[in-house]
């Protein structure tokens, strides 16, 4: 989801609600504590230099149980952030504190913002020797005559 998508969605809802990938809803007293631009400059395992940029929203909950972030206030925060983000329509990554800081993608189902799981991946599979997945499963891949009897 991009910043422009969030702005459009905020214009259609009466309350701002976030749902975690496990289906649980963030407490309604959450705060948006940071919005910024994150740049990741790195070299992948194949030796290719890469740069990724995205907007980062940090969500946090405090003990102020009466706090609610109205859609209009969230839009105002996004407008203030133009000083940092400029006019770039970045993809969004969301941080939310759980047992550690979780990083999520963001989607919208028409009423609720959905925090989506993010996964690691090799960006240079051809260069670092990761084999292609076989097209068909073998019938005898897990037989007792396997080298160690397991799959």
Question: Where does each model-flagged region fall?
Answer:
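Short glycine-rich, basic-tinged beta-strand/loop micro-motifs
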Residues: 51-64
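Charged, amphipathic alpha-helical segments and their flanking helix caps
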Residues: 1-4, 62-87
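Helix-rich interaction surfaces within compact, conserved domain-sized segments
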Residues: 76, 80-132
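Cysteine-cluster motifs in flexible loop/terminal segments that predominantly coordinate metals
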Residues: 120-151
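Small/polar-rich, solvent-exposed N-terminal microdomains that initiate assembly or binding
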Residues: 4-34
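Structured interface patches
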Residues: 42-43, 56, 72-74
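Short connector loops at helix/strand junctions that flank enzyme active sites
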Residues: 13, 27-29, 50-54, 87-89
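Short, solvent-exposed beta-alpha or beta-beta edge segments that form flexible loop/patches at the rim
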Residues: 27-48
């Amino acid at each position: 989801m991009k910043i422009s998508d969030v702005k459009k969605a905020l214009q259609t809802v009466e309350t701002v609600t976030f749902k975690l990938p496990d289906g649980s809803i963030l407490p309604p007293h959450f705060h948006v504590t940071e919005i910024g631009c994150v740049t990741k400059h790195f070299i992948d395992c194949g030796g290719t230099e890469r740069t990724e940029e995205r907007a980062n929203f940090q969500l946090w909950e405090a003990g102020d149980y009466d706090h609610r972030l109205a859609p209009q206030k969230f839009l105002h925060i996004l407008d203030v952030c133009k000083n940092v983000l400029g006019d770039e329509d970045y993809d969004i990554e969301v941080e939310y504190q759980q047992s550690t800081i979780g990083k999520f993608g963001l989607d919208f189902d028409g009423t609720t913002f959905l925090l989506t799981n993010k996964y690691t991946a090799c960006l240079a599979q051809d260069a670092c020797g990761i084999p292609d997945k076989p097209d068909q499963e073998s019938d005898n891949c897990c037989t007792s005559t396997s080298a160690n009897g397991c799959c």
